[in-house]
């Protein structure tokens, strides 16, 4: 986590969280505390291989063969004391969740974006929603038909199968004193030039990214 605001506290859960990455900080935004967390859930099972020709139950059974659902519930469990304070100290949680969102795999998109006719309640995004988190991008861009918000796949992927372009990177938030006011997704290919705000950069990732702007009361 990089911050232009002072980091006044760090949060680590090495004894209870075994994901690829999870941790956070508290930052001081002009006198207002905000907790910011970053996570990276397991990449298996590979979303590129989701069996969209199967039933909803079979797709969910395939997803549950991995550990992402267990990981997100452990994360939400250790966050409970902080979530209880979210109305006074807002929380932002972003990262590579390595799984789709139920907000994107809807009746309206079932025959778009190579979804193969599937409508899926992906459990990780459901868990985040049930824990009180808002998906900042989908809140600001509520129509997945008009704006899917692709963050993956890019040309860097070499798996020899027909690939969907989808959204598996998210910025969630919650709290009464914070509100998303803008959010965009950007996609680019690893190693290619990326132009952002008039400047050219070497792009260092095989994922795109999400840029969300928040307002604090």
Regions picked out by a protein language model, each given a short descriptive name:
Residues 46-66, 108-109:
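A solvent-exposed, charged loop/short amphipathic helix patch at secondary-structure junctions
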Residues 59-87:
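A long, amphipathic alpha-helix that forms part
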Residues 3, 21-23, 67-78, 124:
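Internal, well-ordered alpha-helical segments in soluble enzyme and binding-protein domains
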Residues 17, 63-67, 71, 116, ...:
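Extracytoplasmic/periplasmic, Sec-exported soluble proteins
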Residues 37-38, 92-95:
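Short beta-strand segments
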Residues 81-92, 99-217:
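Metal-dependent phosphoester-hydrolase catalytic domains
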Residues 28-30, 74, 175, 206:
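Short strand-coil-strand connectors
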Residues 1-49, 185:
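Structured beta-strand-rich core segments of catalytic domains in phosphoester-bond hydrolases
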